[in-house]
Amino acid sequence: MKGLLFIMEKLICFQIENTREIERLASNMKIRVIKADASMYNEMLDNIVNGKISSVNDSFSTSISPLLTDNKLPADSILIFCDLSEKHLNRMLFELKSRKVQIDLKAILTPTNRRWTLRQLHDELERERSSIFIKNKIQ
């Protein structure tokens, strides 16, 4: 069995008020749910998904992220799909939609964005949403 690498499917929930439905769906598919809080906003996604959150950020989140002390944490809820199989991703998206689970932004963890912080991912998702909105408005 040497050389086999098992990657566990995970979901990162940020700013999602009621995760009960997501947790229920994930449990049925053996997907782990990680609830990211404000102290993780400046953590790299790779660290969050692998449980390697810096103790400095846990203890001193206000000194590391001054925007959080100004109550400027984004209002958007974010769901990040980490290493889900195509089958599980499709099923999860279908179930979330059919159960009317409200999530503002969704993303898939990629080799590129896994080195980003949650803040950087949020900024990029905001840019993409604005770009789509502008394109739709022009058409």
Stretch-by-stretch model annotation:
Residues 2-59:
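N-terminal, charge-rich interaction modules
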